[in-house]
Structure formats: C-alpha cells, structure tokens
C-alpha cells in the first residue's frame, strides 16, 4: 500500500510540473500578463504623443500661424513694423564696502 501511495504522489508531481513550470504554465502566464500590461501602458503614452505630433503637422500644413509662432519663439523673428524687446533680470547688488580679508590672512597682533 505504501508503494502505491508513493507512486501516486510521484505521478501527481509529474502532472503538476507542466502546470506550474511548463511552456504554458501559470508562472509563464503571469509573467506574460505583466508584460502585456506594461506594453499597453507604453502604447497609450505613444498614442498621446502621436496625437500631439499629428496636430502640429496639421497646423504646419494648413496655416502660417503655427510656422510664424515657432519662428518667433525659437528663432526670435520680428515683423518689419515690430520692435524686439528683451527683458533682462536686474543684476544682484554688490556691497560698496570691500570685504575684510579672511582671518587666516590677517596679521596676528601680540602685545
């Protein structure tokens, strides 16, 4: 009886091996599901990027407004009747009095 139980246990393990570790096993299916979810997320991101690029291409093909806007911001274009004005942040104020030398450079006065 003990031999039959051992044989059935080994047979059960032999049947379970492909289910868990085989080509179509649960572990492989679980890994594939993670890969599919990751790829679906990447596809959604790329779809949004493509829609944005498609809109830019459409604007560039149909009108000069997009081209003019791009030239103004990226190349600094101005029209003939316009003037170019650039705002610059003010420089930080420096103190008028010179800074004293560091303590290591000051002479030691001993009395």
Swiss-Prot record:
Pfam families reported for this sequence: DivIC
Chain coiled-coil ranges: 28-64
Topological category with respect to the lipid bilayer: Single-pass type II membrane protein
Residue intervals on the Periplasmic side: 22-111
Segments passing through the bilayer: 4-21
GO cellular component, one term: plasma membrane
Cytoplasmic side: 1-3
Disulphide bridges, residue numbers: none
Region described as Disordered: 90-111
Keyword tags: Cell cycle, Cell division, Cell inner membrane, Cell membrane, Coiled coil, Membrane, Transmembrane, Transmembrane helix
One Gene Ontology biological process: FtsZ-dependent cytokinesis
Subunit organization: Part of a complex composed of FtsB, FtsL and FtsQ.
Sequence similarity: Belongs to the FtsB family.
Protein role: Essential cell division protein. May link together the upstream cell division proteins, which are predominantly cytoplasmic, with the downstream cell division proteins, which are predominantly periplasmic.
Protein name per UniProt: Cell division protein FtsB
Gene: ftsB
